[in-house]
């Protein structure tokens, strides 16, 4: 095995998906603790509660603007190199969150044991399904009251349409939480509260049919055996092929706050999740062990601090090796660039990078020339597929405070749309400009950046648009008929694509029924 192949085999690149407040931030801290990247799990010990005291580096990042370090974290674990990509929480949820999932090879789904499957999780799982991403599941908050675990598994299967295979099974919950039983291994991992800050070796009780296990479970023993019989009769067994194809998820139970069960999940990522996978380009399929460097940009992050105009373009390496100072071809522009200052995001620091391999995420300084979906190579003309625009879920009409600045407004919005900060639609029937976003914060970011960078002040007005769909049709005549009939709701997006702005869900259903030859797409590839 070449050194490059060995490096690729070590990589695991995954993202965490969850609904806000399911414990994603806590599990991220504990995963970093597993990799010893944060000495005290990102949390400064305060006497009573760890909840509000985050570490200095997070505070510093907040003052500097949107945190970059928390977007990508790289840390070693069990002789592997883990690349963990964060998907932002509630306030800063945006299309970036969806696109981040196009840059990973697997995902960790975190569910709140008291609430089960929630709306944001469903939306993120839909994106994972576009590429059949393998999913590991962690049911969190066992140190609180949770719903019946069997009910939770049923809900995963019914709502997320994926088979659920429990790997561990909880013994009690809340004050009675005693640990988990490993179904295939026939051993109990004992929960000892109060080790949220440190890595401790959990006590193991071999065999459920043992005096030690009976003593540990006490009065619960017989009831647990009954429940286990039910679980083993009704649940799926883990199957590696089904997992890799995104059809089955292994399920673990634990409490991230109590630092229990997180290592089981990370072990699953190392043992079962795929190493960096081949990526499909329009021209051919690119294998990660190829010698020549290739990569694509899936996210551009602007620094909110006006003093730092730098934007970081996040690139997933698909093949070859990045070396400091190497020459790369920016395929869309045809320009060759020498990249001497790419960033890595090791643990909690932004550092200049010496080398990186397939599966790694690197940051390029971007002065407005790089767009989402751009490919970089050592000269080959390649364009990777599967980096989509997603149909926005929220819409606003833009109103200019100074009508003389409409040119600057259009220019600014065009730039921000290319960067992925928002989507812009120009209705066929009016001079309105409509913005689309996935999270409310995107609108605030756009307004503040228009003001700072383009000296344009704007306000937003509500508008009756439920969703957007990109339109295509193989029959030119039918497409023309459709355009005449649907003119009222048609727009052109920032990339020049025909889009249908549906005022209601019912309207969209009716249109899809009436025009069976017209494709109404909820995603559109970046070109």
UniProtKB/Swiss-Prot annotation:
Stored PROSITE patterns: G_TR_1, G_TR_2
Gene3D superfamilies: P-loop containing nucleotide triphosphate hydrolases (3.40.50.300), Peptide chain release factor 3, domain III (3.30.70.3280)
Keywords: Cytoplasm, GTP-binding, Nucleotide-binding, Protein biosynthesis
Function per UniProt: Increases the formation of ribosomal termination complexes and stimulates activities of RF-1 and RF-2. It binds guanine nucleotides and has strong preference for UGA stop codons. It may interact directly with the ribosome. The stimulation of RF-1 and RF-2 is significantly reduced by GTP and GDP, but not by GMP.
Protein species of origin: Pseudomonas putida (strain W619)
Name of this protein: Peptide chain release factor 3
Subcellular location: Cytoplasm
InterPro entries named in the record: EF-G-like_DII (IPR053905), EFG_III/V (IPR035647), G_TR_CS (IPR031157), P-loop_NTPase (IPR027417), PrfC (IPR004548), RF3_C (IPR032090), RF3_dom_3_sf (IPR038467), RF3_GTP-bd (IPR041732)
Nucleotide-binding listed as a keyword: yes
The keyword Protein transport is assigned to this record: no
Pfam families reported in the protein's UniProt record: EF-G_D2 (PF22042), GTP_EFTU (PF00009), RF3_C (PF16658)
UniProt cross-references to HAMAP family, sorted A to Z: Rel_fac_3 (MF_00072)
Record GO biological process: regulation of translational termination
An example Gene Ontology CC term for this record: cytosol
Similarity field: Belongs to the TRAFAC class translation factor GTPase superfamily. Classic translation factor GTPase family. PrfC subfamily.
All copies of domain tr-type G, residue ranges: 9-277
Taxonomic lineage: Bacteria, Pseudomonadati, Pseudomonadota, Gammaproteobacteria, Pseudomonadales
Amino-acid positions noted as binding GTP in the UniProt annotation, renumbered to this chain: 18-25, 86-90, 140-143
């Amino acid at each position: 095995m070449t050194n490059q192949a060995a490096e690729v085999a070590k990589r695991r690149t995954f993202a965490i998906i969850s609904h806000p407040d399911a414990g994603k931030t806590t599990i991220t801290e504990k995963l970093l603790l597993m990799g010893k990247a944060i000495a005290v799990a990102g949390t400064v010990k305060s006497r009573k509660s760890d909840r509000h005291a985050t570490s200095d580096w997070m505070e510093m990042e907040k003052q500097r603007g949107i945190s970059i370090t928390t977007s990508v974290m790289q840390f070693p674990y069990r002789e592997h190199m883990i690349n963990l990509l964060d998907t932002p929480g509630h306030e800063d949820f945006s299309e970036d969150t969806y696109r981040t999932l196009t840059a990973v090879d697997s995902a960790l789904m975190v569910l709140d044991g008291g609430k089960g499957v929630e709306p944001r999780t469903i939306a993120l799982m839909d994106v994972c399904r576009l590429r059949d991403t393998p999913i590991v599941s962690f049911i969190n908050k066992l140190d609180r009251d949770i719903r019946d675990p069997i009910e939770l598994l049923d809900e995963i299967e019914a709502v997320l349409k994926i088979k659920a295979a429990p790997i561990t099974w909880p013994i009690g919950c809340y004050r009675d939480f005693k640990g988990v039983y490993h179904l295939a291994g026939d051993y109990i991992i004992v929960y000892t509260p109060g080790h949220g800050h440190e890595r401790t070796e959990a006590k193991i009780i071999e065999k459920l049919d043992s005096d030690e296990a009976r003593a540990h479970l006490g009065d619960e023993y017989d009831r647990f055996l009954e429940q286990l019989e039910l679980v083993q009769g009704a649940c799926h067994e883990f199957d590696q092929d089904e997992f890799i194809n995104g059809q089955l998820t292994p399920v673990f139970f634990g409490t991230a706050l109590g630092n229990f069960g997180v290592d089981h999940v990370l072990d699953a990522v190392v043992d079962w999740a795929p190493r960096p996978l081949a990526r499909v380009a329009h021209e051919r399929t690119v294998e990660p062990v190829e010698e020549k460097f290739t990569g694509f940009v899936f996210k551009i992050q602007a620094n909110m601090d006006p003093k730092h105009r730098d934007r970081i373009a996040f690139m997933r390496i698909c093949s070859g090796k990045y070396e400091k100072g190497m020459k790369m071809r920016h395929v869309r522009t045809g320009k060759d660039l020498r990249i001497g200052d790419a960033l890595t995001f090791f643990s909690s620091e932004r550092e200049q990078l010496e080398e990186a391999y397939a599966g790694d995420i690197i940051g390029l300084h971007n002065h407005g020339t790089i767009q989402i979906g751009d490919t970089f190579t050592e000269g080959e003309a390649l364009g990777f597929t599967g980096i989509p625009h997603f149909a926005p879920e929220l819409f606003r009409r833009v109103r200019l405070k100074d009508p003389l600045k409409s040119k600057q407004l259009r220019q600014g919005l065009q730039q921000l749309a290319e960067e992925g900060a928002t989507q812009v639609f120009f209705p066929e029937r009016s001079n309105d400009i409509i913005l689309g976003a996935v999270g409310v914060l995107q609108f605030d970011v756009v307004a503040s950046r228009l003001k700072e960078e383009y000296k344009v002040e704007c306000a937003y007005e509500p508008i009756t648009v439920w969703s957007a769909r990109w339109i295509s049709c193989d029959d030119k005549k039918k497409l023309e008929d459709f355009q005449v009939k649907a003119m009222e709701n048609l727009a052109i997006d920032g990339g020049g694509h025909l889009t249908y702005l549906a005022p209601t869900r019912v309207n969209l259903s009716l249109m899809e029924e009436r025009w069976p030859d017209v494709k109404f797409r909820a995603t559109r590839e970046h070109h």
